């Protein structure tokens, strides 16, 4: 297996073995020779289906999909304080995906917007066995140092 050099894109590139395509459970249809991360992005969380059969079906689908050998990571999971979804709901979705990542021993790709304190607390609370990767890090050196000190990995770019 070639090691992908781009851990986060939304479209299968011309050289699919060089990137990990991020998709939601509803859109995951693996193509030959492509690599994926599958997860529930905070922007995709609908408060209206929280705790319903729709949410249960989504989780069931995600749990099945992450066992596919073409899925190399879970995510993009995360916490985004700039969206209109209560933090408690975002944290519930995040925790479930973090636990799933540890269960299947695959890294968790994280979307983080103004959520450093929450992520540091959740990492301590969950104590994951899987790697946590902050996707598209654009913060200052002090923030990078803080994340690295707590065992996070950082990816750069969009």
PLM regions and their residue ranges:
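Mid-domain alpha/beta scaffold segments of enzyme catalytic cores
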Residues: 1-158
């Amino acid at each position: 297996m070639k090691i992908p050099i781009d851990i986060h894109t939304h479209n299968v590139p011309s050289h699919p073995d060089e990137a990990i395509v991020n998709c939601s459970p509803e859109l995951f249809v693996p193509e030959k020779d492509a690599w994926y991360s599958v997860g529930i992005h905070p922007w995709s969380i609908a408060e209206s289906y929280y705790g319903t059969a729709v949410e249960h079906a989504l989780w069931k689908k995600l749990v099945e999909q992450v066992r596919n050998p073409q899925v190399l990571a879970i995510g993009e999971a995360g916490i985004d304080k700039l969206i209109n979804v209560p933090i408690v709901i975002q944290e519930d979705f995040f925790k479930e995906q973090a636990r799933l990542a540890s269960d299947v021993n695959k890294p968790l790709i994280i979307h983080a917007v103004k959520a450093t304190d929450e992520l540091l607390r959740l990492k301590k609370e969950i104590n994951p066995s899987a790697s946590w990767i902050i996707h598209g890090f654009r913060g200052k050196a002090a923030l990078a140092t803080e994340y690295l000190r707590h065992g996070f990995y950082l990816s750069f770019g969009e």
